[in-house]
């Protein structure tokens, strides 16, 4: 278990603390897990000032492999596909794509422009609230936004295809009837929490 701070003031129910990594000068925002081809387990931790990747194969001895400093933000969301981590933030850095094959932390990209599947359009994204990646290699970007001077992107769901290129995803479509705060996909259905509308929507994404 990884915590931005540790408190031992009360007992846990059926749980024992095995180890932790302390981040004394920042705060934790999000966490995601990833397993490499050898079965080693990693925690990918979103922090206010970047992203930390920690080897937790031995949970009693977690080992931070690298840290990527990034623009300060109170929000990051992380998902993985194959050997890459994808990080959204509400600051204007695009989507951070990290190559997890390189445990030095030196191989990553901030991607802001996504070419459509028919090559007729390019979608520009500076910030996004959340993302979800389904097992078929399609990423769903939720709550995207751009600063003044850029065209507003769809702030519902933006769909990216990661299959052809993990570091250069293709823009394949969007649903933009309402702002989506969070969502998930199972089979051909997107389950979307449209917080400002006060409703959940179930959207057919089969095509």
Task: Tell where the protein language model's regions lie, with residue ranges.
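Sec-dependent N-terminal signal peptides
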Residues: 1-9
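Feature marking well-ordered beta-strand scaffolds used for ligand recognition
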Residues: 9-207
């Amino acid at each position: 278990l990884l915590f931005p701070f540790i408190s031992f003031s009360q007992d846990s129910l059926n749980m024992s603390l095995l180890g932790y990594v302390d981040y004394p000068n920042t705060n934790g925002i999000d966490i995601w897990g990833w397993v490499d081809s050898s079965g080693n387990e990693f925690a990918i931790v979103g922090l206010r000032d970047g992203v930390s990747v920690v080897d937790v194969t031995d949970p009693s001895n977690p080992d931070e492999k690298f840290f990527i400093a990034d623009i300060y933000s109170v929000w990051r969301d992380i998902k993985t596909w194959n050997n890459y981590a994808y990080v959204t933030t509400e600051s204007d850095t695009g989507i951070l794509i990290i190559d997890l094959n390189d445990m030095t932390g030196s191989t990553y990209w901030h991607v802001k422009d996504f070419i459509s599947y028919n090559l007729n359009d390019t979608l520009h994204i500076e910030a996004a609230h959340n993302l979800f990646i389904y097992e078929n290699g399609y990423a769903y970007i939720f709550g995207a936004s751009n600063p003044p001077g850029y065209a507003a992107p769809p702030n519902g769901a933006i769909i990216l295809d990661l299959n052809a290129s993990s570091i250069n995803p293709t823009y394949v479509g969007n649903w933009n009837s309402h702002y989506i705060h969070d969502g998930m996909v199972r089979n051909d259905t997107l389950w979307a929490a449209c917080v400002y509308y006060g409703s959940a929507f179930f959207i057919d994404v089969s095509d």
